[in-house]
């Protein structure tokens, strides 16, 4: 029967979840019934005393003060049923005394207004019901007035009462009450029943102790658990509730109290909807309803009763389950029973001693395994069917899309949408195929495991019997070995297919990677996953070869056993009794020839199996070598990556240091420029605020300051005199700017020049002249003071103090001429060889010497000696490189000699080479060109595209190609290099 037909037949059926109405633990519930005169209905309230007690206990642990206050309120003497203390204490949880609410009081859960007449539950204390306490018992039997109970869910009064009960709870022995007296209107005790939880007398202490246990963590953590429920019910509503409860349990049919007749039709308009009842009738009816609800709770359970009374909307998912899940559970139960049956039979082997019993047990095991295989097949066929349908649907839909795209005239948007849909269906088909393969692997795992358990049990039985006794079971053992190898082989081949699919998916993902920040890292991760899959594939293929070898070994053993039986077969010959018997000798010879031919066939088959087993062994060694090579290459790749990372880390550390120094220099230069700008702004502001004010020091103060400076730094001057002919000192006091101006005298005062212009002029002069350090330092004037900036960019004066010399100071030279432009680079054809370079070098040195002295003075103030030395070294290296390049070029020498006219070139006559005897003109490109064949011009765009498609242009593409190459090296090539093993014997 097909699945579609089964769904059609079972469409009108529903599946109810098993154990849907089971309760995890028993709780104590209290029903309170009262009459609402305004609505004319019964107000039914239910309290979960167990949950309230648990909640009050947790609150008691949180705050002991609230418990003490509630205990004080409970001891005020208001122990009546209407008080909160009496309602929350355990003693008040199961009473059944008739009481009535005194006056009108609104209740939010019952009605908008009115005076509810409530029946209170008072627990008869065992001490009160004892013979020595008749007065208290008679006081319980008399109706009393009490306050109404608010019908709110999880009311605060109940919580406070629960806390009071927890604080002032008596001993457990005194609180264990299991029965309640039912009191009639006249005050006589009619019977004793259990109202809250209808348990037996001997079960009451156990139920109470269970109820007083702390709640589980899940219940304490759920703050939304309801402890109270309330509702208004008319007579008709209560009859409908009774019918539903009777459909669950028919024992409740005679338990519903008799309600008065309700007027119907026009009588409801004239006389109202509710019948007229006295207070005594109302109290009696309320109490009977309370007893009925308690009995219904004990008969049907809280879950059904609460759903019937207080639940408005039911979720069908809570009760029903789908038919597919039900059918799957049925298949799983059948499979579980088959497994249990096989396990029972395997356990019987320990007590079996005779071979006859063991053979019977083997036959039963074969039947049990066949039933297990059948149940497993049914289950997995059912599980595979949706994926097969999805695969077929996807293939059909893709075929329709292909036909539509080929035959219909569609626009670009429609074609694009169809292509997206085709890709979606292809993905769904691929996922269905993967699910089918996974389920196939699970199926063969179950069957192979069962077969192996049976085979291992039989091998254990073989040790208990001798060779002669075991000969009867040898054939079954060979069949079992063959079946185990076959099932394991099929399971391993299914695993191999799954791994190949995953490998193919990884390879496609590698090839579809696009450029990005995470592309290289993703490629490395995919390659690592591919390596793990490849190792798993090696293991699976090794197991496949091992199973094939076991199959061949089982066939060889059976063939060898047949050959030995044929050879050991004894033939007895009798004497001839007649002439006809002698004539039958030819037939006997023919039968012997047939036996010999059959023996030869068996031997030939054994040799073939031996050859196949040898090839399997060779393939196993090949796979082992490939696995070792794969592991070695992977380890080498990991080591190389580690080495590259270490090198990169080392280089990166150096680079980080360089970048850090560079950042510090930039930050320092920015700070210097900022301070310089601030200083210039201050100077400009000062000049604008105080124009023409110049403060000059007297001669006496200047001489005293010079003597102090000379006495303070004699050691520093001696050190500088040893290394350089002059000392560059920067004075950081701003007062010496005026002093430097005085030293120059009035004859040397020039027009004021800004600091920026002075600095730019000195820079250009240094770049143009590039004087050597010796010329600069030796030819400086004796004393030159210029207003400059030190490292802190404060106004200061730079003073150059030369060594003590007997020569008098010379007057400053005139201003220098502008620096000459740099010479243009000489062309190669006009170069005159190394002689010209040697002539130019002294001329350049002479020019450098002829540069005026004062031209280098400002640059010497702006740059220190190390920068001048580095500039001079760069000039020397550039000149040496030019000389080396010019000398080392032989073509330059030839051109120079041609220019000088040393020798002349001779025109060479064109000579034709004789063609090769074996070469054709069609294969010679030069011959074709001479004949006038035109070559095809290559387009630049095509050439550019061909170069852009090279794999080495993009690092990601290059990495992908390298990963694919490594994957190809790691993957086994045994399927291409060696022929596949003919394994049709066990594949069929």
UniProtKB/Swiss-Prot annotation:
Residues 972-988 have a biased composition (Acidic residues). Residues 324-360, 489-541, 590-621 form a coiled coil. It comes from the Eukaryota. Induction: By E2F. Residues 51-178, 731-755, 800-865, 967-988 are annotated as: Disordered. Keywords: Actin-binding, Coiled coil, Cytoplasm, Cytoplasmic vesicle, Cytoskeleton, DNA damage, DNA repair, Lipoprotein, Membrane, Nucleus, Phosphoprotein, Ubl conjugation. It is a lipid-anchor. Residues 803-827 have a biased composition (Pro residues). Residues 160-175 have a biased composition (Low complexity). GO terms for molecular function: actin binding; Arp2/3 complex binding; microtubule binding; transcription coactivator activity. GO terms for biological process: 'de novo' actin filament nucleation; actin polymerization-dependent cell motility; Arp2/3 complex-mediated actin nucleation; cellular response to starvation; DNA repair; intrinsic apoptotic signaling pathway by p53 class mediator; positive regulation of apoptotic process; regulation of transcription by RNA polymerase II. Residues 746-755 have a biased composition (Polar residues). Residues 1-126, 478-567 are annotated as: Interaction with p300/EP300. Residues 921-938 form the WH2 domain. Ubiquitinated by MDM2, leading to its subsequent degradation by the proteasome. In case of DNA damage, the interaction with MDM2 is altered, preventing degradation and allowing interaction with p300/EP300 and its function in p53/TP53 stress response. GO terms for cellular component: autophagosome membrane; cell leading edge; cytoplasm; cytoplasmic vesicle; cytoskeleton; endomembrane system; nucleoplasm; nucleus. Pfam families: JMY, WHAMM-JMY_N. Interacts with p300/EP300, the complex activates p53/TP53 transcriptional activity. Interacts with TTC5; the interaction facilitates the association between JMY and p300/EP300. Interacts with MAP1LC3B; the interaction results in the activation of JYM's nucleation activity in the cytoplasm. Interacts with TTC5/STRAP; the interaction results in the inhibition of JYM's nucleation activity in the cytoplasm due to competition with MAP1LC3B binding. Acts both as a nuclear p53/TP53-cofactor and a cytoplasmic regulator of actin dynamics depending on conditions. In nucleus, acts as a cofactor that increases p53/TP53 response via its interaction with p300/EP300. Increases p53/TP53-dependent transcription and apoptosis, suggesting an important role in p53/TP53 stress response such as DNA damage. In cytoplasm, acts as a nucleation-promoting factor for both branched and unbranched actin filaments. Activates the Arp2/3 complex to induce branched actin filament networks. The N-terminal region is involved in actin binding and actin nucleation activity. Belongs to the JMY family. This is Junction-mediating and -regulatory protein. It comes from Homo sapiens. The gene is JMY.
